Amino acid sequence: MILLGSTGSIGTNALEVASHFDIPIESLCAGKNITLLNQQIAHYAPKNVCIADKNDAHKLINGNYKLFFGSEGILEMIESSHSHLLLNALVGFAGLKPSFKALQCNKKLALANKESLVNAGWLLQNADITPIDSEHFGLWYLQNNRPITKLYITASGGAFRDYPLDKIALATPQEALKHPNWQMGYKITIDSASMANKLFEILEARWLFDIESIDAFIEPSSSMHALIEFADGSITTHISTPDMKLPIAYALDKDKAAQMPFIQPLDIQSLCLALKNIDTLRYPLWNLKDTLLHTPQKGIVLNASNEIAIEAFLAQKIPFGHISALILAMMEYFDSFKFASLCDLESIQAFDNQVRAVSSQWLERKIKE
């Protein structure tokens, strides 16, 4: 297996599942957590290793592996790897080109990088992709080739689900990172607090299941992951212990996954499930759901401005409320852009750069106010 993003929460879980399935690890890619990467190299003995920064090379342990660097190094490593299975758990726009390279090299793509579909779903719509996400796994698990009327996914509500409404706008990174149910990376935890993550997942579902009728609810326990309303009027739901090992296992080997208990079963009698509407006063980004489903190419604006905002937020340059404010401002600014012109990776990259530049200028003005 080729694993991109091996030191993150998805990556470490994927390695654990791969060990259960006796899947050898041919290639590992990681960012700045060299200490954990060294442990993985020692344990899994990969033939290829890629790190983000060449200056970190001296920190790596010795081994019989070929070393690659940076974004171009990821693409080179994919090309030189013989494994048929690639799991992309990179964070952000950086995961887009590796997804395309994997498919160009006829790899089976297990996709945890949401931004690949958010930024270029129309170019990937007919590709062989297995999503690694509890919500999309739940939808896949339920669909069973029956005619579908509507898809529903659930949200935890993030760190500010029960937070005083008047204090959210000025919240700090420390407060935004207190997720009630999951232990995840910084970016996805903040995306959960702002509801940007659920917008990403709505767009993913749009491309994966080729349907525009999609909605989401808050389900505080994170035990109910997805619901499908079928043409016959019935609704089914996928309920399980919140544990990413289950969707990862099915993405790596669905036949083996169906035979092995990777998660603890829920105590059904103790379940207390409630579906709540997503309040746009608490989550102003949720106002974008319909426009994104209607023009999903606008996901590029959502993603690029969000990444710029989160970088500034984590650096404590802006309060939490500026994340939504920036994204909403950029969606309005680029509303008249000819999104139909985004027909290849080059045009998507150029537009992404443009959105980032305008977003940075907007933030600079805000910071000076």
Curated annotation (Swiss-Prot):
Family annotation (InterPro entries): DXP_reductoisomerase, DXP_reductoisomerase_C, DXP_reductoisomerase_N, DXPR_C, DXPR_C_sf, NAD(P)-bd_dom_sf
Binding of NADPH, residues: T7, G8, S9, I10, G31, K32, N33, N113, E115, G185
Catalytically driven reaction(s): 2-C-methyl-D-erythritol 4-phosphate + NADP(+) = 1-deoxy-D-xylulose 5-phosphate + NADPH + H(+)
GO biological process: isopentenyl diphosphate biosynthetic process, methylerythritol 4-phosphate pathway involved in terpenoid biosynthetic process
The protein's annotated pathway: Isoprenoid biosynthesis; isopentenyl diphosphate biosynthesis via DXP pathway; isopentenyl diphosphate from 1-deoxy-D-xylulose 5-phosphate: step 1/6
Binding site for Mn(2+): D133, E135, E201
Pfam family, one: DXP_reductoisom
Keyword presence, Translocase: no
Cofactor(s), by name: Mg(2+); Mn(2+)
GO terms assigned for molecular function: 1-deoxy-D-xylulose-5-phosphate reductoisomerase activity; manganese ion binding; NADPH binding
Domain of life according to the entry: Bacteria
Key words of the record: Isoprene biosynthesis, Manganese, Metal-binding, NADP, Oxidoreductase
Positions annotated to bind 1-deoxy-D-xylulose 5-phosphate: K114, S134, E135, S156, H179, S192, N197, K198, E201
Record-listed E.C. numbers: 1.1.1.267
Keyword Manganese assigned: yes
Family: Belongs to the DXR family.
Function comment: Catalyzes the NADPH-dependent rearrangement and reduction of 1-deoxy-D-xylulose-5-phosphate (DXP) to 2-C-methyl-D-erythritol 4-phosphate (MEP).
Protein name (record): 1-deoxy-D-xylulose 5-phosphate reductoisomerase
Gene symbol of the encoding locus: dxr
